[in-house]
Amino acid sequence: MELFWLEHKKLWRKKIVKICVLLCFVYYVIFGSILSFQWFSFGSSDDYTSAFGNNFDGYTVIKDSQGYALSFGGELTDETLQQIVSDYQQMEADGMEEELEKTDWQIVNSWLGTLYPELRDTSNYKTMISYVDPDKLTGFYERRQQVLDEFLEVSGQVGAEKEFLHQIERKVEKPFHYEWVEGWSTLLGSMVADLGVVMALFLGIVLSSLFAGEWHDNTSALVLTTRNGWGKIALAKILTGLAFTVELFALLAVSSVISQLFFMGTAGWDMPIQNIKLIAVAPMNMLQAEIYEYVFVLLGAIGFAGIVMFISAAVKNNVLTLLLSLAVVYGPMMIAEYLPYGMQKALDLIPLAGSSTDIFRTNTFRIFGKLIWSPYLLITIPVLIGILCMPFAIKSWSRRMKA
């Protein structure tokens, strides 16, 4: 334990570590959460040209949007959808531009495009919610089921795989509960989902020198070696890397959740994620989905930390270690679209290379003839990869230093 605390203090004393933590906090919490809520994503539109043209009034807009949605709150039925669309069209006809921003029009419009494609008028430049006849918006859940079946067939997910996904989907409670959806859509679709990508960069910078840096200045390690041995020092470094990973995650996640609670509160936590993407099969509400996404990031970050520390132990150069570490995450992201679908799914199992938003998709893996829903593997395989790398990091570094 003494070795661990010494290594932990040594890591946090480094100026580069403090700078990285500060930059990561500013980028993700200040810009990605607080300013996103207050300005970029939810500030009322001013010039309609960019997020930077928005007014600095996101808190008020969010509260007004939540209040407006409550007038339709409860079960999402055909009548509810018709009322939402009719109310939007009436406000548009009355020229209530500011009031329109408080509606869930983007979400509702996506529902219309998914479930009622035959009502789309290609000659009309307006969005569907502006011109569609509300009385024709019937059979919401029947149409959703039909669209889901068609999607699975087009995706080649038939037979046993289709039935497997239907078994998962049957656990989704219907009718759906409805409140303001747009906030949760932004939160789960980008704010939380992007945390892993952001952490990967700064973890790579900090942890790449954890072992490799000792080749440039190993005086303190040499002193400790006379009493403890390289293996124990290596283990202390591994524990330090893991501790830093968890500490960075906790700082970002807790701060982000506090920001979320301030701006959004807890309203809508029990809505199903199907309100965001209708053909999602996961039987999750918004809160469960958020918890999953944070777990995905934490376990993925631990897995990535294990890989970075292994590379750092095996490579003497800090810069090369950093480049190789970042290539592990960002490389698959850059080449995935050029690869067969099966390889794309395999690359998603690399720590932080996949996406927590897979809970909105219908991806599966077949392992030894057994179908497994992809979100299960996306939170288990990455952390296992990292854990498997750690003993090799200890052995590799100890062997190199002894030599």
Name the predicted role of every residue range.
Residues M1-L23:
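N-terminal Sec/SRP start-transfer signal
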Residues W5-E7, L11, F310-A314, I381-A403:
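Junction motif at the cytosolic side of a transmembrane helix
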Residues K18, G231, N318-L320:
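Residues that define the loop-to-transmembrane-helix transition and helix capping
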Residues V21-F25, V319-P332, I350-P351:
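Central hydrophobic cores of alpha-helical transmembrane segments
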Residues V26-Q83, D133-E214, L235-A314, N318, ...:
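Secretory targeting signals
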Residues D217-A221:
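Hydrophobic transmembrane alpha-helix segments characteristic of membrane transport
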Residues L224-W230:
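Short helix-to-coil transition segments within interhelical loops
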Residues M343-T364:
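Short hydrophobic, aromatic-rich alpha-helical segments embedded in or entering the lipid bilayer
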